[in-house]
């Protein structure tokens, strides 16, 4: 086990004391109060882990001191206790090391969820609908709020494309590993020979960006208004409430028509645009880290097949970590999705520990 520098831990404890004192004094303005409260919430967990680690270290030192005593019975007792105490110390150290890993600044953010039907025609669109329902149920279980921002329905149901906002604390941390190509294997209802068809849909999860995260110059935008359209292209209202925003420098285009209010559609379109620009900027800045992540757990690039949902066998396989669950219905219901997410988070943490020389 690699020792954790004591001075680093002391610095964290000192910062915890400073933040606690500042908040207790009641002198922080509203913006600083919110930021410090969030910092204290994060620090509380780390401080608890530091104290647990140091208590385990102290207990191990006590056992090792007993091994040096002259009393044979005490030495025998210490020798018997040492493996268990050592294991507890190592577990506390591992938990603390994970706490000290570099944090993704976007982890606490809400997210923009984009699902697009891939190969497979109508069946792919139906599968895109299945994925949206899975994430909606998962969001409900987590106490998050999910709202569709824009949608392009499939001819037989489901979606050719659907974009949704998922709001809540820590949404991106849980959903970011869902980005990639999801494959489904099942017998379509229209298949008379009982043959299994393979279809796919792509998922992109972007951290929601606020105006302070990314500045969008109005001069760089081309904004078009039009009447909202329903299935088949017919107009569904008489006012030009639909909004299409083109970000000229990047070529990113966002179209939103879900609300009857042009103002609300514009606000939602800008939220999606900021998220896409923010993700583009993050990708450029974090290229080295992304390369390391690709080597460890898969990039989550949309071109990469990350997961297969096999209906005849009732299984879900995540190819990045070679994990198979025979819980297809539970995963699609959102109730077993955490089993996949937790495994992906654990693998990602192991990769980061190795990169930090702590694994």
Swiss-Prot record:
Chief location category: cytoplasm
Give the UniProt entry's GO cellular component terms.
cytoplasm
Q: Which InterPro entries match?
A: PCRF (IPR005139), Pep_chain_release_fac_I (IPR000352), Pep_chain_release_fac_I_sf (IPR045853), Prokaryotic/Mito_RF (IPR050057), RF-1 (IPR004373)
| Localization (cell) | Cytoplasm
Which cysteines pair up through disulfides? They are none
Q: Region annotation Disordered: residue ranges?
A: 283-305
Keyword set for this entry? Cytoplasm, Methylation, Protein biosynthesis
| A Pfam family that the UniProt record links to this protein | PCRF
* Function, as annotated: Peptide chain release factor 1 directs the termination of translation in response to the peptide chain termination codons UAG and UAA.
Q: What is this protein called?
A: Peptide chain release factor 1
* Annotated source species: Methylobacterium sp. (strain 4-46)
């Amino acid at each position: 086990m690699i020792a954790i520098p004591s001075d680093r831990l002391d610095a964290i404890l000192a910062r915890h004391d400073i933040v606690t004192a500042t908040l207790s004094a009641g002198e922080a303005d509203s913006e600083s109060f919110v930021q410090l409260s969030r910092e204290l919430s994060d620090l509380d967990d780390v401080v608890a882990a530091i104290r647990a680690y140091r208590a385990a270290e102290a207990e191990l030192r006590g056992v090792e001191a007993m091994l040096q005593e002259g009393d044979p019975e005490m030495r025998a007792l210490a020798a018997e206790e040492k493996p268990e105490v050592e294991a507890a110390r190592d577990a506390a150290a591992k938990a603390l090391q994970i706490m000290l890993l570099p944090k993704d600044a976007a982890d606490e953010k809400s997210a923009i969820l984009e699902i697009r039907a891939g190969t497979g025609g109508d069946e792919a669109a139906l599968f895109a609908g299945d994925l949206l329902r899975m994430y909606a149920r998962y969001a409900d279980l987590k106490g998050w709020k999910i709202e569709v921002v824009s949608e392009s329905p499939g001819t037989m149901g489901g979606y050719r494309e659907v974009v949704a906002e998922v709001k809540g604390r820590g949404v991106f941390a849980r959903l970011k590993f869902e980005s990639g190509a999801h494959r489904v294997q099942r017998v379509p209802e229209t298949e008379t020979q009982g043959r299994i068809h393979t279809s796919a849909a792509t998922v992109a999860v972007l951290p929601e960006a606020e105006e302070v995260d990314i500045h969008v110059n109005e001069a760089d935008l081309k904004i078009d208004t039009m009447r909202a359209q329903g299935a088949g292209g017919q107009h569904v209202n008489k006012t030009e409430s639909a909004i299409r925003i083109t970000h000229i420098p990047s070529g990113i285009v966002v179209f939103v028509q879900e609300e009857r209010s042009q103002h609300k559609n514009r606000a939602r379109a800008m939220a999606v645009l900021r998220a896409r620009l923010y993700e583009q900027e993050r990708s450029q800045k974090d290229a080295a880290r992304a390369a390391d992540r690709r080597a460890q757990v898969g990039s989550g690039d949309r071109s990469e097949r990350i997961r297969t949902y096999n209906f005849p066998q009732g299984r879900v396989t995540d190819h990045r970590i070679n994990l198979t669950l025979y819980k297809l219905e539970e995963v699609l219901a959102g109730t077993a999705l955490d089993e996949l997410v937790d495994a992906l988070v654990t693998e990602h943490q192991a990769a980061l520990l190795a990169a930090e020389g702590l694994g």
